[in-house]
Amino acid sequence: FSREQCLEFARGSLAKVLGPEFTVVDSYPARVRLPDEPLMLVDRILSVEGPMGSLSSGRIVTEHDVLPDAWYLDGGRCPISIAIEAGQADLFLCSYLGIDQAVRGRRTYRLLDAAVTFHGRLPRPGDVVRYDIRIDRFVRQGETYLFFFQFDGTINGEPVLSMRNGCAGFFTAEEIEHS
């Protein structure tokens, strides 16, 4: 998927990106989206694996280009928070795997927990950071869905950061307000 398709996923129609089986999702009052600019940090989606709409495990591989004029650079480096946020395509993957059809626009995404480890230097201009993101499983308790995920970020095949024990869920506005 191209950057333009990622931006369409963020701003526009899910069906235009993933196909007509997702048309109903475009009518929901809320759905999972990648962030729009300036926080769109997915420049390409190289591959997506897993049965579409299955609420099962899956994998997505993305890349983020660290450009010389990137708004977020600090001292010629990508800040820790941006390096982590650039692994944001778990959003695309959970939608592809069917969470929007399950929650029907009544619940929204919240990251609950994760453990991040840095293995090397922070990304610099000219680097391309590849994120290999895996959703291990979805669980449901009543109407609440959670999923568990992890990712590895590399530059030229060298480990830069990893996230383990990632957990995100889908909650109503009332549940979020009272949490």
Label every model-predicted segment.
Residues 1-4, 15-24, 28-32, 36-79:
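Catalytic strand-loop segment that frames the active site of acyl-thioester-processing enzymes
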Residues 1-12, 43, 53-56, 61, ...:
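HotDog/MaoC-like acyl-thioester-processing domains
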Residues 5, 13-27, 33, 38-39, ...:
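Hydrophobic beta-strand-centered segment that forms part of the acyl-chain substrate-binding groove
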Residues 45, 68-69, 78-106:
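Active-site helix/loop of acyl-thioester processing domains in fatty-acid/polyketide metabolism
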Residues 50, 67, 92, 138, ...:
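Residue-level marker of positions within ordered structural domains that often coincide
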Residues 69-73, 104-106, 121, 156:
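Short Lys/Arg-rich amphipathic alpha-helical segments
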